[in-house]
């Protein structure tokens, strides 16, 4: 796994960072990272290492493998890096930190995508 994570050579050293559980990775997440990719930014996806539970049925390592498979081409092309981080309780910044804090507001059809509903459907279909 480390080879995949380390493969993203960059034209510049900066990334648009997204922190999440990605449980599961879905079209809403894809839309979100493509907002940065469409602006020719590289993306760093941080997978929170949360305890397995009903709302987090996969381990962070399983999510990393899923992301590596789903985003293989973007990773190999150097557009995306993925990494596991410890679970967090907040994101804190100071003034003049040297980067922007950006909120992407999705269109309604993307906003309506729910990982909770996806997990419930997967349970009903015996996939979880």
Protein language model features and the residues they cover:
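Nucleotidyltransferase catalytic core that binds NTPs
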Residues: 1-128
């Amino acid at each position: 796994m480390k080879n995949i994570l380390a493969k993203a050579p960059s034209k510049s050293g900066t990334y648009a960072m997204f922190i999440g559980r990605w449980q599961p990775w879905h079209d809403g997440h894809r839309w979100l990272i493509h907002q940065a990719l469409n602006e020719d930014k590289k993306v760093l996806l941080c997978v929170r290492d949360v305890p397995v539970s009903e709302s987090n049925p996969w381990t962070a390592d399983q999510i990393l493998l899923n992301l590596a498979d789903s985003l293989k081409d973007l990773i190999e092309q150097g557009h995306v890096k993925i990494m596991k981080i410890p679970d967090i309780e907040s994101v804190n910044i100071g003034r003049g930190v040297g980067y922007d804090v950006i909120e992407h507001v999705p269109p309604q059809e993307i906003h309506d995508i729910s990982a909770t509903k996806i997990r419930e459907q997967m349970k009903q279909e015996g996939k979880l």
